[in-house]
Each structure stands twice: as structure tokens, then as C-alpha cells.
Amino acid sequence: MFAPLLKKLFGSKNEREVKRMLKTVQIVNAFEEQMVALSDEQLRAKTEEFKARIAKGETLDQLLPEAFAVAREAGKRVMGMRHFDVQLIGGMTLHEGQIAEMRTGEGKTLVGTLAVYLNALSGKGVHVVTVNDYLARRDANWMRPLYEFLGLTVGIVTPFQPPEEKRAAYAADITYGTNNEYGFDYLRDNMAFSMDDKFQRELNFAVIDEVDSILIDEARTPLIISGQAEDSSKLYTEINRLIPKLEQHIEEVEGEVTKAGHFTVDEKTRQVELNEAGHQFIEEMLTEVGLLAEGESLYSAHNLGLLTHVYAGLRAHKLFNRNVEYIVSDGQVLLVDEHTGRTMPGRRLSEGLHQAIEAKEGLNIQAESQTLASTTFQNYFRLYNKLSGMTGTADTEAFEFHQIYNLAVMVIPPNKPLARKDFNDLVYLTAEEKYAAIVTDIKACIAENRPVLVGTATIETSEHMSNLLNKEGIEHKVLNAKFHEKEAEIIAQAGRPGALTIATNMAGRGTDILLGGNWEVEVANLEDPTPEQIAQIKADWQKRHQQVIEAGGLHVIASERHESRRIDNQLRGRAGRQGDTGSSRFYLSLEDSLMRIFASDRVKNFMKALGMQSGEAIEHRMVTNAIEKAQRKVEGRNFDIRKQLLEFDDVANEQRKVIYHMRNTLLAAENIGETIADFREEVLNNLISQHIPPQSLPEQWNVAGLESALNTDFAVQLPIQQWLDEDDKLHEDSLREKIMAQLLVAYNEKEDQASAEALRSFEKQILLRVLDDLWKDHLSTMDHLRHGIHLRGYAQKNPKQEYKRESFTLFQELLDSIKRDTIRVLSHVQVRREDPEEEEARLRQDAEELASRMQFEHAPAPGIEQPLLDEEGGGAPVAVASEPVRNDQKLGRNELCWCGSGKKFKHCHGQIN
């Protein structure tokens, strides 16, 4: 009630923040005259001066005004561009670990240089994150002269880069790369067998370009490094033959069955579910082809893998459409990014779904994969000490940014006011009428010599639109996943007078559409341009530029609404950059997927009430409101899915951090002899307790079982029964001591055969291999647990709480297994002397062989296949505080712990549990 009044009196939070930062802008401006007077060498020397001041205790916040003034002056001299005052505000926003929302054409790339330069002075590295390799290379090479002028180094990380190059790129002051490459390198680092094989340093500060695309759109997509599992191609082929025989079950809204079938499809949640008739029918067919034994159920424990194949086949046929979710190119299924329209070469769906699609398309089926390491972008980017981002559209997702990443969104005022006209949506009864209206609008714009950009949601729609225009004889360019190689060239000239470009979603994002075309691209296409040629190209461009402005600027046509308002705003934002004229219009029909699923009934009834005829359109605020309400509903559902994914992955993430910390500690340690000794003691005590229960009578002891177990686990034959017969004074504790002494004798003999140095090295490699193998199996077990945990809801149990409880038990078992299996291998192995260099070379060869078999996948997002989990009956997820990284001197495992508990380090913070 009072909020509008208070906002009027005091301004919004955003306005107050801008006012606060404007005071710092004035200080930066006050430095400008001083910086202009410096020579190039003096300006460059400022970088070393800043580093020295940081070393003496000065903070980055204290350096900010002067450092920004230096970066601004360097920008003028090297790039010919001076940062505007609003761009300085954007730079401060990034430095403070917030998201800067800036409209298209406001110079986000230039804004990033301010915060990147300031934070690179700390010497801890800055990562600039982009959505694709092209933008990473373009931005790095564009800004490299500026950074190098200031005495900083720049690196670029790319897929399939030689290790030495990649290591050098990460060691640079500023590193450019994609979100995928940073995430996969983090996982690779935690699979390395030597500290020298690791790439990344401490994750210090990241600036994410198009932050909404990476942290929101791709948040549901886990990053997975996998290795090949067993070949099941024949099974996929057999299942694929059966799926078309299943029919979809369709009901009207009132629940009346219009078509009885075997499965239902929920387009809202992208789920497919077999009903009772479907289960019976598929079981009969599987029995006929010999895949299921007579009388057996698909839900028997040993048949669950078969059930997974059936569901993978169903999803491949009913939820994944060619030229929408994927394309087929050169005999391969290439996934299409739903948010950018680009293909993702090398990325594969997991859980057998990719193989099912290959079977459906009649392609060669590649072997299944097993997860070796995984994480999500949500958890990876939260590892950075400081995180920030830039985008043209973040305000609609401000709540999610704050909830998940603790990032505030700051709307940066534009340098010039927006001059774009956004017309109301036009809604038609059918898609055919909608496309006819779009063609009419295109013709009108081309007649006025206006450039037009038509945005489509899928490749299929872009090709349909292209066919319609070809029939009309209208010249145009198509930009989708099939023609992505020409992306930069097409986008560069999309602003020419009368140019018509059709693009899927946000293809070309990150490249401005300049009115009149891009004269710099024209110059770049000439082999050795003369000053006269360049001057002529500029003059021609100026004429075209003025011609387009007088015609009304770029006109953006959208063929349908996206699920997210943000994606729609991104498309609109292609027009009206830097105060240019422009316009946008959305054309919709009741047959569009969003309208059909979420907004159809209300709008359809409204249109019927108006007595609309074929070919007529409705243009009303009520319709636009209904559509936006549907979009908010979808956004809310997607946020719930992403939040649920995070809550589940947070459990796995705490385990991941423990395992990776353990692994890094092992890699850094020169001698893990004490750790192995502790393992041996614990494993032995557990083994003895199983056969000689604590405080039990001798009659309850299973001596024969203990002798057998010691032979199996420790490779020693001990006459325990004979000891007991010969010595009446032997009791439980003294027996433990005697057994341990014998084990030490046996192990010391191994050390004598080789050498202490060789055995220590061998212990480390064995522990690393055991840890990696068991962690890989643990990930698989956790996946199975997560996919079935929602069924606990039927037993009135909270699935999330059950998942936490069971995953904790599994993790405890994992840690016990690591200790037990390590000791078992070390006890049985025969050690021989080997040259350390030969051993290291062999291990490196093994690691390279493993790397060659790795696949890098985007898994289908967990949480989509099952309904959202009920929160009732369970509390919020327990936050586990991470321990601070300590850089002080390493403690011996038998020394007192640094925390002051009075315990030995090995029993306190050095304990492996």
C-alpha cells in the first residue's frame, strides 16, 4: 500500500545505487586530466604501481577510481573508444559482484574491461565467460591490444587445445573461454594424476557475458565427463521396432477418453508415461521377441534396465523431434541449443536417450557411456570467490539470481534514450493465417527499404518461413543450426536497406546488427585495402545508414512467443540499439505451442465472443496480459525445476567437494605413508570387530572366519586359533595388537623388496585409482537413487529428505570402501623396483588413454522426467558450511590439530570421513 509512495519519495533501490555510484564516477572523471598528461610508458607503468600498492595492503576498492581512469584513457588511445559515465557504473557493478543489465549496443564488452583490469591487478586471475568459442576468440582478440598495452597477459581456452597451451592460457592475467570449457576443465583437473597435469588456478573472479543464458537457461543441464560402457546397440534397435506399435492415450479436459492408448504425453513437463494397458502391451511384445522372460514383470529388479530402454525409446519418438531438438548431419545426431538455435557438436544426451534417437533415425548407434565426473553450472560458478555478469535482459529473473547465486541485478541507465516502438501482439486463429500476415508485413517493410529480422523458435519454423518467402520470390538469408558457419557474415549485413534475415531464437547473439550494414566487415573482406577504398566504403555505409534510419530502422518480427519473457525481450532488443529507431511485433496463433498448452482456452473463448472470422487478428491488451501470465507460469515452473535440481545436486556437491579435496590433498602430498597406516589400522579393527564382537565372550568368536578374512583382505595366513590355544592370556585387545604387528612385518617386507620411495609413490597411485573407480560407481548409484526417489512420496515420505539420508549412507560406505579396497590391493600386490621416470611416463600414458575415451555430455536435466517433489513434511535443505582454504605450513598427521581441539590432526581436521 505504501510501497509506491515510498518509491516516489526515496526512489527505487536501483535509482539509489546509481546515485551512490555517480559519486565515484565524479572521482574517476577528476583523474582524467591527470591521465591524459601521461605518456604511453607512464600510463603502462601505472599497472606495476597498482600491483605494488596492493602488495602493501591497499584494496581494490581503494584503487578503483584511479584504475578505472587508467583503463578509460588506455581505451581512448588503443581502441579509440572512451568509456561513458554509465559504462563506468556498469564496471563498478561488475566489480561489486553484481549483474549489470545493459541494453543492446550499450557496449557491454567495453564495460567488462574496467572490472577485468581492476581485478586482474590482484594477480589471482580473471575468467571472462562467453556462450560460444567464436565470441571467446572475438572478444579476447578485440580487447587483447588494450590489456597488453597495460602490461597484462591474455589467454584463450578452447576445446581440443594442447595441454601446454591451455595451461598457459589459465596462467595468464585474463582468460577467455566458454562456460562449457571452464566446467569441463574443472572436472578434468579433478581426474588428474599429477599436480603438473592440472590446468586451473584458484577460481578467483568471473565475468559472465550473457549471464542469463548461462546461469538460467543452461542451469538445468549437468556437465558430464563419461567413458564408454557396454554395447547395447542391438537392444536399442529391438526396442525401436516396438515403440511405433504403442498408441498415445488422449483425453479431453473433462476426462472423457477420446482415444484409448498405451501412454500419455504431458507437453508442459515434457514427460511421457506408460499406463496400465501400455505396460501390459509392451511386456507382451518384449516376451514375444525374447527380451523378457515368460511371466516376468518389467518392474522386477533385474529388468529395470529394460524399462529404462523402453522409456528412452518413448521419449526419443514422442518428445524429441528432428529439426527442432536435434538435426541429423553426416550420420550423427547433433543436439540443438533451444536458447540459441546453435548445434552442440560433441554433446550427447545421457541415460540412453541419445542412442534411442540414433536408433529412431536409423543411424549407427554409439556405445553407451558411464559417468566419470559431473557437476552443474550452478555449483561450478558458485565456487568462484566473486562472480558477476552482463546481459541485456536479467531483471525478469532477478529473484532467481538472488535466490540461487546471491547476485543482485543492477539496471544500468542507457547512454541514449530508447527510440524503438514495440507494437501489441497480433493473435490469429490458425498458424497459416499468422504466416500469411507475417509475409504481408515483410513485403511492406521491404517496399520501404527497411531491414527486417524474423525470429523463429525452431529450425523447422525457419525453414517453413523460408519456403513461403521463396514462393513469393522474396530474397532472404536463413540463420539456423544448419548454417551456423555463416552466422557472423549474415548478422553483419542484416541491417542493410531491404535486407531480410530469418534467425532461430537468439542466433547471432553477441553481434550487433548495425543499421546500413557493417562497414568494418566489408573492409576486412578486402585483401589489402587502400585508404581511398576504406574511405569510399565508409561513405557508402553512411548513406545506407541514413537511408535505413529515415525508413524507420530495423523491424523485428517474432513468429511466436517463447516460454520466457526474457528471450522475447532479447529478440526485441536486436532493434533500437544506442538510441536508433526501430520497431518490433509478435505474431501469434492459437496453434502455437505456448498458446495451445497454457493460454489457449481463455483467449479462444474471448475470440469466439468477438465473432472473429478467418484471417482476422485480435490486438488487445487483455490478450497480451493472458500470454504474459502464461509465460510467468512457465517461468515459475522452470524456476522450481532448476531450484529442485540445485537442492538435489547440493547433496552430491558436498560429497564432490570432499572427494576432490581428498584427491587434491593426495596429489600435493609427497608421502602418504601415515594415511595408509591409518587406513590399515581402521580396516583391520573393523574386520576383527565383525568376527570378534567387542566385549564378547571367547565362545562367541568366529576365529576361523577371521583367519579366512585376513587371508582374503591382507594376503596373510595367521594361525590365530593356535595362538589362542598356546597363550591363555591373549584377550581381544592384545590379539588386535599381535595381528597388527604381523601385518606390519609383512608390509615392511614389501618395502625391503622395492624401496621406501617407490612404495610411497605406488601407494599414492593405487589410492588415486581406487578412489576414482569407486567415485565413478558411486555417481552411477546416486543417479539411480535420484531417478527413483520421487516414488517415496507415495509412502508419505519426503523424497528430498529420503535422498539426503540415503545418499549420506552411500557416501559413508564409499569412504569405507576406499580404505578397504586400497589396503586390499596394496596387501596383495607384488612390488618390484621401477625407475620413477618410467613409472610416471606409464601413468601419464594411462591417463592419456583414458582421456581419449572420454565423452563430454549435457545430460537431460534431472527433475524434468518426474513431477516436482512435495515440500511438505521436510525442512529446508541443510546448508553445509565449507571449511576455509588454509595455506599455512602442513601438519604431520600425528601433530596436534591447528583448530585448538587438543586432538591429533589425523583424528580431527585430517580425518578422512
UniProtKB/Swiss-Prot annotation:
GO CC terms of this entry: cell envelope Sec protein transport complex; cytosol; plasma membrane
Gene Ontology molecular functions: ATP binding; metal ion binding; protein-exporting ATPase activity
UniProt keyword annotation of Plastid present: no
A single BP term in Gene Ontology: protein import
Signal peptide residue numbers: none
Catalysed reactions, as listed in the record: ATP + H2O + cellular proteinSide 1 = ADP + phosphate + cellular proteinSide 2
CDD domains reported in the protein's UniProt record: DEXDc_SecA (cd17928), SF2_C_secA (cd18803)
Cell compartment(s), UniProt: Cell inner membrane; Cytoplasm
Bilayer topology annotation: Peripheral membrane protein
Cofactor note: May bind 1 zinc ion per subunit.
Ligand binding (Zn(2+)): C897, C899, C908, H909
Keyword field: ATP-binding, Cell inner membrane, Cell membrane, Cytoplasm, Membrane, Metal-binding, Nucleotide-binding, Protein transport, Translocase, Translocation, Transport, Zinc
UniProt superkingdom: Bacteria
Chain residues that bind ATP: Q87, G105, E106, G107, K108, T109, D512
Subunit structure: Monomer and homodimer. Part of the essential Sec protein translocation apparatus which comprises SecA, SecYEG and auxiliary proteins SecDF-YajC and YidC.
The family this protein is said to belong to: Belongs to the SecA family.
Protein name per its UniProtKB record: Protein translocase subunit SecA
